[in-house]
Amino acid sequence: MLFSLTFLSVFLKITVLSVTAQQTRNCQSGPLERSGTTTYAAAGPPRFLIFLQGNSIFRINTDGTNHQQLVVDAGVSVVMDFHYKEERLYWVDLERQLLQRVFFNGSGQETVCKVDKNVSGLAINWIDGEILRTDRWKGVITVTDMNGNNSRVLLSSLKRPANILVDPTERLIFWSSVVTGNLHRADLGGMDVKTLLEAPERISVLILDILDKRLFWAQDGREGSHGYIHSCDYNGGSIHHIRHQARHDLLTMAIFGDKILYSALKEKAIWIADKHTGKNVVRVNLDPASVPPRELRVVHLHAQPGTENRAQASDSERCKQRRGQCLYSLSERDPNSDSSACAEGYTLSRDRKYCEDVNECALQNHGCTLGCENIPGSYYCTCPTGFVLLPDGKRCHELVACPGNRSECSHDCILTSDGPLCICPAGSVLGKDGKTCTGCSFSDNGGCSQICLPLSLASWECDCFPGYDLQLDRKSCAASMGPQPFLLFANSQDIRHMHFDGTDYKTLLSRQMGMVFALDYDPVESKIYFAQTALKWIERANLDGSQRERRITEGVDTPEGLAVDWIGRRIYWTDSGKSVIEGSDLSGKHHQIIIKESISRPRGIAVHPKARRLFWTDTGMSPRIESSSLQGSDRTLIASSNLLEPSGIAIDYLTDTLYWCDTKLSVIEMADLDGSKRRRLTQNDVGHPFSLAVFEDHVWFSDWAIPSVIRVNKRTGQNRVRLRGSMLKPSSLVVVHPLAKPGADPCLHRNGGCEHICQESLGTAQCLCREGFVKAPDGKMCLTRKDDQILAGDNADLSKEVASLDNSPKAYVPDDDRTESSTLVAEIMVSGLNYEDDCGPGGCGSHAHCISEGEAAVCQCLKGFAGDGNLCSDIDECELGSSDCPPTSSRCINTEGGYVCQCSEGYEGDGIYCLDVDECQQGSHGCSENATCTNTEGGYNCTCAGCPSAPGLPCPDSTSPSLLGKDGCHWVRNSNTGCPPSYDGYCLNGGVCMYVESVDRYVCNCVIGYIGERCQHRDLRWWKLRHADYGQRHDITVVSVCVVALALLLLLGMWGTYYYRTRKQLSESSKKPSEESSSNVSSNGPDSSGAGVSSGPQPWFVVLEEHQQPKNGRLPAAGTNGAVVEAGLSSSL
């Protein structure tokens, strides 16, 4: 709707079509966004890395995205540094003896000046605008301006200087000696030269930590001594050592914040670790065909303090840098500036104070053939109805459709004198291929991740929703507020936590997890909800893994998907074992079935609270994507064609776009919420996807083929980055951030943690204090102004101490519900489709990972598996007796890569600690009113009154014999019982639900003619046999009727013959009385005794015999006079 209103306001009277043209965008507003009384600082640009690989210079974000080549042929021997304010990279090509520079986007490459061939170090003084170089042979440090002019020698007579560094905020420079392991320091004036330390080994890498004012270095040491990074303060004291993960000598290092980055010989990767401990490691794997990276630099505003960021610069400065369409006062500039100071399309006002728009259409120099429209800073050509604008953006051509096939054009085609030409709808332009359209009016949304705002027929700009900032590419949007987003994902036997850049990778929950495939979180109460497949219940815990508690323990069979309605305060899950979708409130007390008809094997599920809809995948015999209301009504089929096994499903709540993955087709697809505009996002390179999540500009999905988590651009499916690290089967995953689930109000739960007033803003709780109070340093509590003054006076260092705690890494303290596995190593794979690690092409087996052993790398099976690293098999801890399950009170259930303990019947607990249930005291026994219940270990006995004197007598009114069996005078529970009320309606077609203890499952006893777990399928073999038997009976009946009918016809014919003869004889008798007389006389003779019976019709009867299964293939036979005849009919005629 937003797009439609904006688009119509610009193009209400324009009906022409547009083609290629340059996009023009306005400069953005200031760096702060205001929402009520709360001010949010806009997020600065993301940090990225610049490094040399081979003879090319690359850049890449620390999370592995935006990997691109800046300089193709930079030289082989290179030293380099950057100037953040200029947005430029400087480097020295030692072979060509040139100092060169290029912008961070790869444009504007130029040569600054010639240099000597012995340059051994380069550093940028970003405050004074100077370049410092060391010459190892001349032993000098030279200083020039940023254009290579005004050269002067700062220091001379040095011993082979190299690795020069500068901290202009402290007015200090540092360098090392090539031959010895010495570190030196001087001020920027070349005075106060000091040697900080001396070491026997050569210092190969030297870097500065501007934040903590420390030096970090690595040395080319003896065998076994290359595994350390050393540091000291600016005075050479407080020396510290950390161990790095590389197996060879380091080539380069960089520092940013609390992270240290490095690369090493023979390793095509960049390591990222905690600079204090060397742990919390992330490995960024680059193209395996390349050489190790060198000259690593972290580019960010804070890497060069005092640099004015473009986001913090004045409007005039930003517009000058980008030559945007801004109006600004010249009072901020040189008053003698001329019109060249204004951006293109603008000119100086008459009073020379402002830049104003130039009306190119009025100047008649626009070149448009038919129509011209002026816009601020530019113009565009228009055409009347029936004409279209040609690719030059100037000429109009009559609209003549192309004949025949025009499928190569993404939108439409016209016929011109130069041949067929692809065209685009108004507001979009043709891409470089001349076939594909892009723009606000096309499906790619102009390349904008969120909002596309048209400026003209051929130009537009991108914008973002509240809470997001437009990034440097002017297309992507990133969250501008809140904590750092992270991933939560189920890894079959545990739940893990990881930031997008692979840092803070740890296990949150692993104890008694079994098999977990379903997971989601509640942003209001900051809770994780997950389903246990092996233990058949649903739990929840805090986002840090603490305070585990069971929520739903009855009626859960095989949960494979779970979704939390963070607004309606409910949870929904799919149960493939019961073929249902169920729901409950967050307490688990109001449990109900949502969908049970026409559903086979539901798996993934997503909820849209604002649309009040459920979306799910069904992997059964008729794979499909479906939707319904939150109550299960109004079911809608989203997709059913071209599906094999749709698994995960997710919603982009900002654009109302549905995403799903198909495990067997190895594809990710997207569509509108009603199933329209369906298209494939990625194909053939997503492995075995199981689950999805969407946030910012990316789709995340889990892969079982190469156990890992992958992300791609949510619009194009490109820029694939893979994160892996000792994963088994990563399943359900979610992105945790206040903006990930819009509309969440954390103030609803315990007032958002605020003592006084809580205001929700973009998914976060903003605490305010009542009049007369001020906020405490924790931002939650409120203090009286008097207490605040005391706090500021007597405890002056407290605020500093609190700030330090807030800025320090959060400690991970394990408890009973969590493990100490916070040292997991994450790997970022940015090598495209090529997959290779230190263990060789293809890596290790599916249940193994690659580890370092000295300078070698070997495959090692994951925990819970055994083998040679290439082939690893699950260890059955239950069979081996190596589990921690108490044998008397619990049973061991083996799972892939682990096991879980489940309390036996009659016990309760967490599976490892099980206590006897006193059924008699709880009233959960099955004894009759007249019996006495006696609790036993793991069970109970029912005793009849007077039973010892009368053993074996049943108790009157005892529990049903179907549930109890006789054992002397006691009634004990049988192994088969009925199902709980939650299973009502589970068995279909007349089936009876019952619990079988031996298999620990609820099963259905189907009536004859039906089969399946829920008796949902007809027994085709039984129906076929029944049909065949019915057919045989039908055939026999038909034949029998035919035989009877034939017999009746014969009898009727015989009776007719007899009647005819009788009448004829009577007629003849009347004509010959003498003959009749003589005949009557003779009939009374002795030989006429038998002839008397034949004077009337002889009696006939037929006996039919049915042959149910004739073996000789002959029809059923008939007999005369009671005799059975094998074939045909017989008579005495």
Curated annotation (Swiss-Prot):
Where it mainly occurs, coarsely classed, is membrane
Write out the ranges of the repeats annotated as LDL-receptor class B. Answer: 87-128, 129-170, 171-212, 213-259, 485-525, 526-568, 569-611, 612-655, 656-698
Query: Which PROSITE patterns did the record assign?
Result: ASX_HYDROXYL, EGF_1, EGF_2, EGF_3, EGF_CA, LDLRB
Q: Name one GO molecular function term.
A: guanyl-nucleotide exchange factor activity
Q: Give the signal peptide, or none.
A: 1-21
Subcellular location as annotated: Membrane
Membrane topology summary: Single-pass type I membrane protein
Q: Which GO terms describe its biological process?
A: angiogenesis; branching morphogenesis of an epithelial tube; cell population proliferation; cerebellar granule cell precursor proliferation; epidermal growth factor receptor signaling pathway; epithelial cell proliferation; ERBB2-EGFR signaling pathway; ERK1 and ERK2 cascade
Query: Where do the record's glycosylation annotations fall on this chain?
Result: N105, N118, N149, N405, N930, N941
- Annotated TM spans: 1036-1057
Question: Which cysteines are disulphide-bonded?
Answer: C361-C372, C368-C381, C383-C396, C402-C413, C409-C422, C424-C437, C440-C452, C448-C462, C464-C477, C747-C758, C754-C767, C769-C782, C839-C850, C844-C859, C861-C872, C878-C892, C885-C901, C903-C914, C920-C933, C927-C942, C944-C955, C979-C993, C987-C1004, C1006-C1015
Residue ranges with Low complexity bias: 1076-1090
- GO cellular component terms given for this protein: extracellular exosome; extracellular space; plasma membrane
Q: For the EGF-like domain, which residue ranges apply? A: 322-356, 357-397, 398-438, 436-478, 743-783, 835-873, 874-915, 916-956, 975-1016
User: What keywords are assigned to this protein?
Assistant: Disulfide bond, EGF-like domain, Glycoprotein, Growth factor, Membrane, Repeat, Signal, Transmembrane, Transmembrane helix
Name the CDD domains on file. EGF_CA
Q: List all topological domains (Extracellular).
A: 22-1035
Known partners and oligomeric status: Interacts with EGFR and promotes EGFR dimerization. Interacts with RHBDF1; may retain EGF in the endoplasmic reticulum and regulates its degradation through the endoplasmic reticulum-associated degradation (ERAD). Interacts with RHBDF2.
The free-text function statement in the UniProt record for this protein reads: EGF stimulates the growth of various epidermal and epithelial tissues in vivo and in vitro and of some fibroblasts in cell culture. Magnesiotropic hormone that stimulates magnesium reabsorption in the renal distal convoluted tubule via engagement of EGFR and activation of the magnesium channel TRPM6.
Write down what this protein is called.
Pro-epidermal growth factor
